[in-house]
């Protein structure tokens, strides 16, 4: 499969209302099926809402939760990514993304970088994930899943691309700065994200699929603006700011091959060099440097 139809589920989840949010997801799945979608992506914590605080434990699910499997069965025939609060066997809570395929929960990724600045307080409630790897999908393409803040840390897109990802998928609950500027054609947060994603797409020669939620929680506005960037860093599709909906676009996976042939950055990458230098830097920070040049 070289052409993939991608759907961006730019939803407005209800805070703490899992049943209502499951219904939103099921409706979007039905709509996506009617549009012959191959890859359907929902936002970070789409099943729960974002500003949960003490509601986290109430809305958390284990990865074998029947409700997740019901979603997976409903989405059979598509590769679907959903955001939820995961409860581990050790009763730790994580912000997570599940890849649903062929009626099963195929893969679960836990958010690696938890912001604790401004209005963000994620470390108070969640554990940080300790695994980052790309995953093969039924589409014949390797996906690299990450969540919101992860994309603001260089190792995440770099490692996923080194692990063979052809599509980087970032699901987000990004609140907006300068929301009043939308009517003037701008939004500070959206502009920052757009620059970030175009840069990573070019440097990794991957497609970037970014899905951000919309809606308001406790006076915090989430701006949407979900988009798809091609491996050359060009915007393939950008959803409207602040509007909910299911937005569909097509991508050609041959663009990855063509761009990597013309610009072989991954071929020329030196992970062993990076690893050696990181080991040196870690030793230096621990006061164990050996004066090696």
Regions found by a protein language model. Name each.
Residues 82-84, 95-99, 133, 226-228, ...:
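Short beta-strand scaffold segments in enzyme catalytic cores
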Residues 1-6:
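Extreme N-terminal starter segment of soluble prokaryotic enzymes
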Residues 18, 27-112, 174-199, 203-206:
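Cys-nucleophile CN-hydrolase/nitrilase-fold catalytic domain and related Cys-dependent amidase chemistry
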Residues 23-37, 155-164:
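Short amphipathic alpha-helices and their capping/turn segments at secondary-structure boundaries
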Residues 10-16:
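Short polar catalytic/cofactor-binding loops
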Residues 63-66, 88-196, 262-265:
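Active-site catalytic loop in hydrolytic enzyme cores
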